[in-house]
Amino acid sequence: MAADPLPPSAMVQPGTLNLNNEVVKMRKEVKRIRVLVIRKLVRSVGRLKSKKGTEDALLKNQRRAQRLLEEIHAMKELKPDVVTKSALSDDINFEKTCKKPDSTATDRAVARLAGHPLLKKKIDVLKDAVQAFKDARQSAPAAESSESTSGEGRCKDIARSKDDARESQHPERTVVREQKAKDTNTAAKNAASGSKEKLAKTEQAPRAGTTPGSQGRPSGKGAGVNSEHQGAPAPGDSNQGKASTKTPEDSVCEPANNGVSEEEESEGEKEYFDDSTEERFYKQSSASEDSDSGDDFFIGKVRRTRKKESGVHSSAKELKPLPKVPSKTSTLETPWDVRNDKHRPIPEARKFESVFFHSLAGPKSSRRDPREQAPKNKAPDFPENEPPVKKQFTKSAYRGFESVKQTMQAPLHPSWEASRRRKEQQSKIAVFQGKKITFDD
């Protein structure tokens, strides 16, 4: 029996098949079919109970009605997913399950629901979709491999056909290509042979240049004559020496000239060494200064020590103290001068105030001049005049305190008045500190 096609909403794509989702979608259908089946079974139970006949027929009908009731209760307890999965896994036939002697009410209920025509259509469609999905997955690798091989074969065939068509249309081009290839091969061979000939000529030329020079040298002359010839060679000989390479005879004649050549080499090395190091640079710069001293080893050190000494002298010059200006306070003053200085006008008003000493916090007239304080250790000639000076300092401090009192006697806030009175009382009490106070005092 061929399965009817599903509507577009229920169609299953083989590429995106998820069986669990399909089972969940089937729950609604299973519940609707279960209601229809239960309604039908209830009607049949009522019919069986209403039948009349012999006692055996009545007992038989009662047993059938009891079975149907058990199936109805089993259907109510069944879950829709169990019905769908069992229908998808096996081909369930209701008649076969009923004929089994050990079949239970749940087995019969599942078989009855799965055998319903509406649910059976949906289950068949799902089975077909699952089978198509399996076939697609199995045939996909084989199809890809066959397509790839066929595509490669087609590309090769197309390329060959295009080449054949071009050759058939333009046969002259193929001939030109072949000729070009032959020309390139012959040119490469000619270039290789020409390079070999040039190398052979260059090898023969230096050999021909070296042999006449070696034959023309006299063998009987001593080492002194050879050294003279080497010391002052002719310009033509020098050019020949540059062009030709050294031969074994030249290398044999070299030990006779060691004396002159070693001196020249040592001079060249010394000049090179003088230019390359810092101490030799100092030596060249100080050659005019130290020309008398023949010892070259200590010249670099002398230059460094001179630099250090010059640096020390410059720093000492910078750190020289400035000439001291004699201060006015350093001169000795007598107490008589101090007394006379009192009446002099103060040159500059000083703005230093003390928090702890009232004598320093007073107005300008009551402040002490710093010159009033007689230096104790610098003026030891007048020891008998020290007590009057001290009394004078205490008097001036007391005057300053009184002037502060006068300035504070302006009308103030009550709290300020109270603090002022308290301070006055404290100043009076301070007189009696350390004494026994009697009633008369």
From Swiss-Prot:
List all Low complexity biased stretches: 139-152
Q: State the coiled-coil residue ranges.
A: 52-77, 118-140
Q: Where is this cross-link: Glycyl lysine isopeptide (Lys-Gly) (interchain with G-Cter in SUMO2)?
A: 201, 328
Keywords, comma-separated and alphabetical: Coiled coil, Cytoplasm, Isopeptide bond, Phosphoprotein, Transcription, Transcription regulation, Ubl conjugation
In what ranges is there compositional bias, type Polar residues?
A: 237-246
Q: Could you tell me which residues carry Phosphoserine?
A: 214, 276, 291, 293
Example GO CC term: the record gives: perinuclear region of cytoplasm
Out of the domains of life, which is the source? Eukaryota
What is its subcellular localisation? Cytoplasm, Perinuclear region
What is the annotated role of this protein in its UniProt record?
May be involved in regulating transcriptional activation of cardiac genes during the aging process. May play a role in biosynthesis and/or processing of SLC2A4 in adipose cells.
Q: How does it assemble?
A: Interacts with SRF. Forms complexes with SRF and SRF cofactors ARID2, MYOCD and NKX2-5. Interacts with the N-terminus of SLC2A4.
Q: What is this protein called?
A: Serum response factor-binding protein 1
Q: Which organism is it from?
A: Mus musculus
Q: What is the lineage of its organism?
A: Eukaryota, Metazoa, Chordata, Craniata, Vertebrata
